């Protein structure tokens, strides 16, 4: 919005030309989201407390968590509002990619909101059934995947009301390398052709998988939000490079017109995430809830598939991957041993993995900070693939 206003007024006020620079708008999006989050955080926490939207804590988990019972949840609303306002203020409204990411983010946020609402207001610990939640995740993920597969290839910029016009004719052939190939990190000449069906399936799996992986990781004070910020920042760098014709050519990446605008979204996510961490750091004043975790995970997955860095997301988000695998392994092993021995056995003290370390003697803050450190290293490894190819 501010970009269009600045372009309209820049002939009379030349200093407004600075708004045309993507990096300037990215910085401002970060600051704007940070300020909104810090300014409205106390009010949101107070309102959630008044509404008695408190988190129920499982008694079978670490006993140190029992003191958290009643802490306001659904704080992810603060993150999403901060991202939305900041992104819409500083992005180019005609960019297709921005709207796709926003659709997935807030669509998954709506799923999480309903799930949280049922848990804390209706006092239903199950929330949405797994089948119901998966159905809506699948629907939104497939809509995004199909749109990205068949949307116009040549340019990402259109008028807002033209976002869904002539979309099939522009994308059926999938003639752009960034759409049809899976890019393999560290190898500049190796990529795997996907085709239409392959692209849609991969996009769907990455979006839904990323959303659920981030949600599973959200179990300790401050644990998930910092990795989300770090991975989002890393993907923002890829978006900037892939969207810049000069940098993408120099680094031997396919040029994706308009992808650089996703840096605005990633920067807003970073600012909103840091603001939320201010209140979510141990001891947490508010929890994110599914409304935030599902949405942010979906956002990371969507950005990754747009910039064709699905494997890099797997690397940078290694903590999310390991946490998810720990749950899958725990459930699978329990079922196998129950059939074989008549009694289920566990691979870990408790899943997801962060609870395993807690029950092993690590303090909550130790688990959190150590997972942050691991994520920092993984993000650096992911960023190294820009040059080490």
From Swiss-Prot:
It is found in: Cell inner membrane. It is an enzyme of class 2 (transferase). Its cofactor is Mg(2+). It is a multi-pass membrane protein. The keyword Cell inner membrane applies. Keywords: Cell cycle, Cell division, Cell inner membrane, Cell membrane, Cell shape, Cell wall biogenesis/degradation, Magnesium, Membrane, Metal-binding, Peptidoglycan synthesis, Transferase, Transmembrane, Transmembrane helix. It catalyses: UDP-N-acetyl-alpha-D-muramoyl-L-alanyl-gamma-D-glutamyl-meso-2,6-diaminopimeloyl-D-alanyl-D-alanine + di-trans,octa-cis-undecaprenyl phosphate = di-trans,octa-cis-undecaprenyl diphospho-N-acetyl-alpha-D-muramoyl-L-alanyl-D-glutamyl-meso-2,6-diaminopimeloyl-D-alanyl-D-alanine + UMP. Its main location: membrane. CDD domains: GT_MraY. PROSITE patterns: MRAY_1, MRAY_2. GO terms for cellular component: plasma membrane. GO terms for biological process: cell division; cell wall organization; peptidoglycan biosynthetic process; regulation of cell shape. InterPro entries: Glycosyl_transferase_4, PNAcMuramoyl-5peptid_Trfase, PNAcMuramoyl-5peptid_Trfase_CS. The chain crosses the membrane at residues 25-45, 74-94, 97-117, 134-154, 190-210, 222-242, 259-279, 286-306, 311-331, 366-386. One of its GO terms (molecular function) is metal ion binding. The keyword Iron-sulfur does not apply. Its EC number is 2.7.8.13. Pathway: Cell wall biogenesis; peptidoglycan biosynthesis. Belongs to the glycosyltransferase 4 family. MraY subfamily. Catalyzes the initial step of the lipid cycle reactions in the biosynthesis of the cell wall peptidoglycan: transfers peptidoglycan precursor phospho-MurNAc-pentapeptide from UDP-MurNAc-pentapeptide onto the lipid carrier undecaprenyl phosphate, yielding undecaprenyl-pyrophosphoryl-MurNAc-pentapeptide, known as lipid I. This is Phospho-N-acetylmuramoyl-pentapeptide-transferase.
């Amino acid at each position: 919005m501010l970009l269009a206003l600045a372009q309209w007024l820049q002939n009379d006020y030349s200093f407004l030309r600075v708004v045309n620079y993507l990096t300037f708008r990215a910085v401002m999006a970060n600051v704007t989201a940070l300020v909104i989050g810090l300014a409205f955080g106390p009010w949101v926490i107070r309102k959630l407390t008044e509404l008695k939207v408190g988190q129920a804590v499982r008694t079978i988990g670490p006993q140190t968590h029992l003191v958290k019972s009643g802490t306001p949840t659904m704080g992810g609303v603060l993150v999403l509002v901060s991202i939305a306002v900041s992104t819409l203020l500083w992005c180019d409204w005609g960019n297709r990619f921005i709207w796709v990411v926003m659709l997935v983010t807030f669509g998954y946020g709506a799923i999480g909101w309903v799930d949280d609402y049922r848990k804390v207001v209706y006092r239903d610990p199950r929330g949405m059934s797994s089948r119901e939640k998966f159905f809506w995740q699948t629907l939104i993920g497939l809509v995004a995947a199909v749109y990205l597969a068949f949307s116009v290839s040549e340019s990402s910029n259109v008028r807002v009301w033209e976002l869904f016009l002539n979309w099939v004719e522009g994308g059926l052939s999938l003639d752009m390398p960034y759409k049809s190939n899976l890019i393999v990190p560290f190898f500049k000449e190796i990529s795997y052709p996907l085709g239409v069906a392959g692209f849609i399936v991969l996009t769907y799996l990455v979006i839904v998988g990323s959303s659920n992986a981030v949600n599973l990781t959200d179990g300790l004070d401050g644990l998930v939000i910092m990795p989300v910020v770090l991975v989002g920042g890393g993907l923002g760098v890829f978006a900037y490079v892939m969207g810049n014709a000069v940098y993408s050519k120099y680094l031997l990446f396919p040029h994706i017109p308009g992808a650089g605008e996703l840096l605005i979204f990633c920067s807003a996510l970073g600012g909103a995430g840091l603001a939320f961490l201010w209140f979510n750091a141990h001891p947490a004043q508010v929890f994110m809830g599914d409304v935030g975790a599902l949405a942010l995970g979906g956002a990371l997955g969507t950005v990754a598939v747009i910039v064709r860095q699905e494997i890099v997301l797997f690397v940078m988000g290694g903590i999310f991957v390991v946490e998810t695998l720990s749950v899958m392994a725990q459930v699978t092993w329990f079922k196998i041993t129950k059939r074989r021995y008549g009694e289920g056995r566990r691979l870990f003290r408790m899943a997801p993995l962060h609870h395993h370390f807690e029950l092993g003697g690590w303090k909550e803050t130790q688990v959190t900070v150590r997972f942050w450190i691991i994520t920092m290293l993984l993000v650096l490894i992911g960023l190294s693939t820009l040059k080490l190819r």
